[in-house]
Amino acid sequence: MPARPVTHRTLIIARMDADDETAVADIFRESDGGQLPRMLGVVRRDLFSFHGLYFHLIEAADDVAPALPTVREHPLFVDVNTKLGKHITAYDPETWSSPRDAMAQNFYTWAAD
C-alpha cells in the first residue's frame, strides 16, 4: 500500500540559542525513532534556527493540532517537552498557554502543477 501523501504542514516558532541546536536535534532524533511521531501522524520534521529563533516544520497527512490534547499527558510527549524545555522558550511567554500558541498561520500557498 503506498504511503499516504503529506497534506498538512505546521510551523512552530519559539526562541532558542544557536548553541543548543545539537542538543535539540538529538532530542528529536531520539524521539523520532520511537512511536510519538506516528501517534501524531508526523511523517517529516525539519528544524531551523535564525538569529535566536527556532523554527520547527512538521509535515503530516492531517493537521496535528487536534491530536495534541490527546497526547499531551503521554509519557513520550512529556519526556520530549521536558528535555526541550531546557533549550527552547516561548516566542512570547506572556501570551503562550499551549503548543497551538506557537503555531504560525499560513496565509499563502503556491504549488507547481
Describe the predicted segments one by one:
Residues 3-18:
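Short glycine-/aliphatic-rich beta-strand segments at the starts of folded cytosolic domains
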